Amino acid sequence: MTAPSQVLKIRRPDDWHLHLRDGDMLKTVVPYTSEIYGRAIVMPNLAPPVTTVEAAVAYRQRILDAVPAGHDFTPLMTCYLTDSLDPNELERGFNEAVFTAAKLYPANATTNSSHGVTSIDAIMPVLERMEKIGMPLLVHGEVTHADIDIFDREARFIESVMEPLRQRLTALKVVFEHITTKDAADYVRDGNERLAATITPQHLMFNRNHMLVGGVRPHLYCLPILKRNIHQQALRELVTSGFNRVFLGTDSAPHARHRKESSCGCAGCFNAPTALGSYATVFEEMNALQHFEAFCSVNGPQFYGLPVNDTFIELVREEQQVAESIALTDDTLVPFLAGETVRWSVKQ
């Protein structure tokens, strides 16, 4: 006789860092998020980036048009910060509940970030306005100087950009997104109530050995890049400790297969279909399932000053195999953990 499956019921989660792209890709990937999550912070790094209220409103509508009937999902829009952004435009979007937050990409740090910020001084009037109105700043925390090793970019960002910024604007709410190092985990843990972080499933489950030993695995390649195991362990300990200023942010970032499996492949893991079960696996491995719901469904809304979702979902603990690929116009998408057997999945 087969033992009954273990079921884990939690308040509906939110994804506080998500890439949905646009066009056919958007239509393909939105349902994988909207069937599970109540809300998601949608990244603005389209081409061209989302820098105006009108662009955000139009993008939000394209997202909503792709949400299947029966899914109750709210996209939370963000503004892409540039050196030339008008603070008045940002404040208008925030006051009209179009922009939930603004995103700081250092120029050329990741996909479609060539329009990003060249220096903090260049956007200081914008940041001062954000501090004044209580608008959160979302930060891709890596320096991009050519002489700095890719594995050191996050730690160097803390000392050269993040800490001086927070010393200068002490009331600014900051989310240090997709942190990947012990340095960042310690920095956020030791910070005040105006500093929080998101962490992806891939940075909790894997380290750079998994990506590079025995062959290059392009579908584990993302930015910030996977680090050594001591950093992975620090992240696992932070999220499963019950610390309340770290929350779910998948950084799900879809690219067509041919753009990942190439001589110069794109960075990003399409983890929306498998992320929640992956997080549950980590919490179970760390004997910390009692903190799982807070990480997924409570800590984020608390930091943003939003209500928690009033519906619930269930995860079931039974082995399931992840699809090898997902159909996309003229190509396919390879999901995170493609072809692998996973322990936890969302109950349908």
From Swiss-Prot:
The active site is at residue 251. It comes from the Bacteria. Its cofactor is Zn(2+). The keyword Metal-binding applies. Zn(2+) 2 binds at residues 103, 140, 178. Binds 2 Zn(2+) ions per subunit. Gene3D superfamilies: Metal-dependent hydrolases. Zn(2+) 1 binds at residues 17, 19, 103, 251. Pathway: Pyrimidine metabolism; UMP biosynthesis via de novo pathway; (S)-dihydroorotate from bicarbonate: step 3/3. Substrate binds at residues 19-21, 45, 140, 223, 255, 267. It catalyses: (S)-dihydroorotate + H2O = N-carbamoyl-L-aspartate + H(+). The modification N6-carboxylysine is found at residue 103. NCBIfam families: pyrC_dimer. This is Dihydroorotase.
